[in-house]
Amino acid sequence: MARSGKISSITSLTLFADAIGSKNLKKAIKVLNRTKVSAITDFTIPLLRAWTMVAMGDYKKAISALEPLTRIQGFEPMRLHHIALIEDFKGNKIVADQAYIRALDKSKSIRTLQAYGRFLERSGRRAEAYNLYTKYQTRQGLENQMKEEIFKFDTGLQRSGMIRTSSEGIAEVMFNLAGTLT
């Protein structure tokens, strides 16, 4: 821990994971509040705070927690992706649909494409889901993932949302962090 009382980013992520694992959400928020600002924490802290707010059942604060991402160049698609995931998780179909569309307008992220396709399938809009998958099937870098989505689509099985628990939302943040660092 630094003399300022702030926690380094790696230590912070470890303490946060421990607090979340023990379902101590208030402690998790305290850890986030004490984390030193860095290139990594600039975007991870708002995302982790948002999903912790989801775990607390405060969806309004969850969406508000994502606001700092608007000030980081290039992170608007990620902010919209998480808004869509949160609204989808909450069951707010209209807002989720709009957020998915806005996120895809900004960036054709494979995670957003997959999440939106599943959303469309669950919403009974199978033709739209299929069109989404096939539209991006030939895009460089997306071929394998879209083929997998089409294969799953063709099975006709009921698809779950990408995020089924707030813990999965936090895991999505870690997945996004890994993708950003590579």
What are these regions, as identified by a protein language model?
Residues 1-182:
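Alpha-solenoid helical repeat scaffolds
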